[in-house]
Amino acid sequence: MLWTRITPAAGGASAPVQVRWRIGDDDRLTRVVAQGTVVARPERDFTVKVDAAGLRPGATYYYTFDAAGEQSPVGRTRTLPARGTSRLRLAVVSCADFEKGYFNAYRNIAARQDLDAVLFLGDYIYEYATTTPGIERVAGRVPAPAHECVTLDDYRMRYASQHLDPDLTALHATHPCIAVWDDHESANDSWRDGALRLEAEQGPWAARKAAARQAFDEWLPLRESPRMYRRFGFGGLADVLMLDGRSYRDQQVLPSDYVALTSPRRSMLGAEQEAWLYGALRSSQRAGTAWRLLGQQVIFAPFVPQVGSALEVDNWEGYPAARTRFFDCVERDRIADVAVLTGDIHSSWGLDLPRSPLSGYDQTTGRGSLAVEIITPAVTSPPFFSRAGARDRAKQFHSASPHMRYMDGERRGYVMLDITRERLLAEWYHVRTVTERTADESKAASLVCERGSARLVEAGL
């Protein structure tokens, strides 16, 4: 999927613009393999998408757009591989708050030459007002509009503002992207019929949700569909199942409301998406695909009571029946080699996924684990343990969670996945800072899941 946005000339904001596109197999576009014209229209905020057909699988292509006498920079993309591919490399990102710092993680991902795709797990933008009290900002990082995003024009302006960032645009110009939303593309802690602390003057939630979804569809290079959840096949090596944990979920409840919290009907994904997920897992397993990767938003792993009580019920801990149904499917249908990929919590985690970390799970051997979870840190958003005593709290959190194989609650960055038929390698990269634009980063941890093991161990052991 090729994407660009045309900036209308002054006074021409209502006139459609003819756009020519070309795609070829060399960076000078001397060998054009497909081309055509499309129209950028004001009702789509002058964004343009091209679903280029007839391309070879597993191949790198280069593309450009021409409009109104101007040519875009040449972009690079890659097609999904054919069956029989032996290696897959993915970058995983989430939580990129423009105000909180520079997108150094995006900069470093854009510089990589060895990626098949980038997975965005949500919070691509933040809807907050720039005047929200108590929020620390990096000088010069002020998105538009200044007020909280509520209308379609607001959300469009926020995406347009964020796309002025050179590191974000470099990433999109270099790698194909697979994206799903979380809450901040609409409103904090959103659920099926609302969100946290909505104001009456902001209008009905349905209209705001529809506006947020339209802007997301316009500004992201994805094939549009009424449903956001979808499946990507990487040549029989991995199936990536991108889930929508916001549009269909039941409302969050207080931890003290035990009856509501433990209701067997409680759902994170909604009945239709849940059935689709289980069907996709079964068909992937039957097809002999090596790995099943679930791209989703909030922490999936269960936690021991004294630790879990400190977490928000916005995650799967607040939907225990839905999590149990997932475990039932994996166990009943013998679904193997599942990795849950998570964002949202602004920290780096690697976990085994047993039904309970305190019963039927062996920390030493991994027996009882049914899958693994890999959580990517924030690109810029404030770290999970960002205040005084962060390291001590992280150690306490870690020691109370026997299924936790790695955690860093202080640093920003991204995760790299290197996948073969024999193993899945997860590497956490942390940037030195987000308060200045720099490429400085370090590899913080490497965990591996051997096929058939459903557990994470340190790479090289």
Question: What positions do the PLM features span?
Answer:
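Metal-dependent phosphoester/phosphodiester hydrolase catalytic core
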Residues: 1-461
